[in-house]
């Protein structure tokens, strides 16, 4: 649009607006040259924000931190894999053309892995073959991945129970130790994912059952058999410690037998690392107020409730062993293998796992744990006062080396063998003749006889397992976590393992 000015010249609307603006500014400046302006301060008070705003801010902060952490870790891991592969090729006498093809193949696998990482897994990707275990927080199933036919053990955890029982830090630590480990002594984790109600851990299936089943069946082991299993347990515990974790729940139930008869550690639900997300206080701060927990839980979520057990003579030890399996599936668990310093809560380190090993060795040779009693509270009392309660039956004769090793493991933390590392235990005379580098290559004392890849004959039939379901009892409304809380607590739980994703027959 144009208009004619008083001088007869045509001006545009833009030129007119600019002229008016300059005029108005000049007029204003004439009378304001002496006026001073006070600065304006804005005070941001977070307390005035709504709960929803706080939750969203916390969620964004946590997700950004996780995104940055994962991006850096993936880049470092990818570069390290290439460097390791190049170092391996440098020692290969093959042609340069062949090496180049192998490097290109690695690059293709890396690209494929990145695409697969973005693929969301769900329960629909797996077919349940059989339920092989139940617990207070979930269950374990033998499953088959639909697109590949591969067999796994699927551990499911109920999210609401994790909140109620104050298990968030332990859940994260369990996932992390399984994801970080590539040791042959630790159960391999292939995937982890979640939905609105459950967490899922997809792990290797070990068809030989566990050490507890063997102890129930055979009562006791010879010293040679005990030496084999305890030596392998030492290497397994050492592998966990090297990752910077404390297992805290070493017991026969958590020592699994693979198809070759060798052991692997499992169930890191009470493990503790040194990352902030492995500390319950982190989640309490994250949610602003502490989530109510069960009255039976103690600090570190080690629960000790009364269990009706009877053991006043050898004849009644059979009753204890029968109830032993029931305890394994209960919310309470068994305190028989827990170190005294964990109960007293005066601080403890990795040496607490060596106490547990001593208790297992005692049971392998004697037939029952060293402090088993009529109930869990009595066991707790005996462990605290271990000096007055540790004794060896006179009618059972152990070698001097075996008894000495047990006594050096079942002692105070500051005197315990292994407090400076696993090598001190390996050097004990009881293990004279053990080749620590090749022990996994020798024939195990017991090798499972399997009929198929889905053979579960070494697992107890589910009908005989205590009826502990995944359904939670009614809870108060303030104990039910909000969707935002659940999202915050389990950010970063998803995982896929690279080495399995790139093998022939991609998962």
UniProtKB/Swiss-Prot annotation:
This is Serine/threonine-protein kinase CBK1. Coiled coil: none annotated. Its EC number is 2.7.11.1. One of its GO terms (molecular function) is ATP binding. The keyword Ion transport does not apply. It catalyses: L-seryl-[protein] + ATP = O-phospho-L-seryl-[protein] + ADP + H(+); L-threonyl-[protein] + ATP = O-phospho-L-threonyl-[protein] + ADP + H(+). Residues 1-30 are annotated as: Disordered. It comes from Pneumocystis carinii. Belongs to the protein kinase superfamily. STE Ser/Thr protein kinase family. COT1 subfamily. SMART domains: S_TK_X (SM00133), S_TKc (SM00220). The active site is at 249 (proton acceptor). One of its GO terms (biological process) is regulation of microtubule cytoskeleton organization. Residues 126-431 form the Protein kinase domain. Keywords: ATP-binding, Kinase, Nucleotide-binding, Phosphoprotein, Serine/threonine-protein kinase, Transferase. Residues 432-505 form the AGC-kinase C-terminal domain.
